[in-house]
A protein has these predicted regions:
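Long, low-complexity, Ser/Thr/Gly/Pro-rich intrinsically disordered segments that act as flexible linkers
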Residues: 102-109, 113
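Long, basic N-terminal domains or extensions that often function
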Residues: 78-79, 85, 112, 126
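Domain-length cofactor-binding catalytic modules of enzymes
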Residues: 2-29, 36-43, 49-57, 64-67, ...
Length: 464
């Protein structure tokens, strides 16, 4: 199903069956600002109301941009590592995953001392090759200084410690399996607190920029009407107009500074996910097949190559492992075609992508069709049908546990109930609405799931 919505400055096409009044209002809100002018706004099937704008928005960016539309979790997305027909000890795997900082944790915290050394050696891999980090020659803080807004950042050491950490909310680490028995490591995370600080900083600038322009406009009009003597009184009573201040936008130099920092945040988010994948897989080899601490993974094109110079005698003779991987980003601006995607993903012709449904039903692995009418985009998930508050108030823990039967997880609890399968739209409603933009290659089902919980993690309990 698709329909159009119109506003003062533009029109949007909505590809959705299920949409509520608040979501509709937020779409029209964008169209009632200059942001909607000639922006080719397309709304994805998983759309729902978000903080300040609709999750599921795609639009073209030219001479203005609103940081709130991209959002605070800049560069958030999914990393998929194809593990093949590997046998996994999920108990050991879970213990390793619990040592990845999640929620508000970071590697700067003393409780992660036993992993911090491993983290540093791991981060040397290709961080310097990407220009992001070289642990020996350049302190990580030097990379952060590339940000135009560096001097406005708070707690930079903690931001550095967030590299390779999961975060909370709907972020997860999962192992899925397809019908042929192939397993997939799936990691969903973003730019952590860095993206939040950058987004909020530039949204404040957008407001200041808008207020300044409006004030200058009032002054100009007063002078043109011969009311200069009344100018001070006029300025006291002038009001900010018309639309929600969450949609104030940047132009000119401020916009270019934002785009510069946005690109860096997107890079940070990408390597944050890659860091976690390397740490998990390296540690799993060390714990299960006798690989010594020298095992190191490196990213090369669309592959991860792990090498160990020494293997414990009698365990295995293999010392090189190669896995394919791909990534799907959903809160970002694509600088190749200047398409902004907020809760939506790229679906270029032939492009492989993942669309997660929920922690019970797994994900769709799809191939993009390059549909221009869809802004070459697809939904980033099933989309919420219950807000976090509604889920906590209406879904019982027993119902949640029942839904997750058969999936290895130690994080099903009251604190993650807002991410339960019942909080999301049914898979069928998404599958039926994406045929024009992607073809479904396969459905992968979870056998393991981890979400950040406010409860004390297992690895910390063991230290007591």
């Amino acid at each position: 199903m698709e329909f159009n919505l119109k506003g003062k400055y533009g029109e949007a096409k909505v590809f959705a069956d299920i949409i509520d009044d608040r979501t509709t209002g937020q779409i029209i809100g964008i169209l009632n600002t200059p942001l909607g002018e000639n922006s080719h706004v397309r709304i994805m099937p998983d759309c729902h109301a978000g903080k300040g704008c609709v999750v599921g928005t795609t639009m073209h960016v030219s001479n203005k941009v609103c940081p709130n539309i991209v959002g605070v979790d800049i560069g958030c997305g999914m990393l998929v590592v194809e593990l093949g027909k590997i046998d996994l000890d999920l108990k050991i795997f879970d213990e390793i995953v619990h040592k990845i900082p999640s929620g508000h944790e970071s590697y700067e915290e003393p409780s992660h001392d036993e992993y911090s050394g491993k983290r540093v050696s791991t981060s040397e891999l290709q961080w310097y090759g990407s220009g992001l980090i070289h642990c020996n020659e350049n302190h990580p803080g030097n990379w952060f200084k590339k940000l135009k807004c560096f001097n406005e950042l708070d707690q930079v050491p903690r931001l550095i410690g967030n590299l390779g950490s999961l975060g909370g909310g709907n972020h997860f680490i999962e192992v899925d399996v397809d019908d042929d028995g192939n397993k997939y490591l799936v990691i969903h995370s973003g730019s952590r607190n860095l993206g939040k600080q950058v987004a909020e900083h530039y949204q404040k600038i957008a407001k200041k920029q808008y207020v300044s322009k409006r004030r200058n406009e009032v002054i100009r009009m007063a002078k043109a009407e011969g009311k200069e003597k009344d100018l001070q009184e006029i300025l006291k009573t002038f009001k900010l107009p018309v639309w929600d201040e969450t949609l104030f936008y940047l132009e000119d130099e401020d916009m270019q500074n934002y785009l510069h920092d946005l690109k860096l945040c997107q890079e940070f988010a990408l390597w944050n996910r890659r860091m976690m994948a390397l740490t998990i897989i390296e540690r799993y080899f060390i714990e299960t097949i006798g690989a010594h601490e020298d095992v190191v993974g490196r990213y090369k094109d669309d592959k991860i190559v792990f090498v160990s110079k020494t293997i414990n005698v009698g365990k295995t003779a293999k010392s090189v492992w190669t896995y394919n991987f791909f990534e799907t980003i959903h809160n970002y601006i694509n600088f190749d075609d200047m398409i902004l995607r907020k809760g939506s993903v790229s679906a270029k012709e032939g492009e492989r992508l993942i669309i997660p449904m929920n922690m019970r039903d797994g994900s769709l692995i799809c191939i993009g069709k390059g549909n221009e009418d869809w802004n070459i985009s697809a939904p980033h998930g099933a989309g919420r049908i219950l807000s976090r508050g509604e889920a906590k108030n209406t879904v019982s823990l027993e119902e949640y546990k029942e839904a997750m039967k058969g999936i290895y997880t130690t994080t099903v609890s009251q604190s993650t109930i807002d991410e339960s399968p019942m909080a999301y739209k049914p898979m069928d409603s998404i599958v039926e609405n994406i045929k024009d933009t992607v073809s479904i290659e396969k459905i992968i089902k979870p056998i393991y799931n981890f979400k950040a919980s406010t409860e004390e993690p297992i690895w910390l309990k063991e230290k007591e």
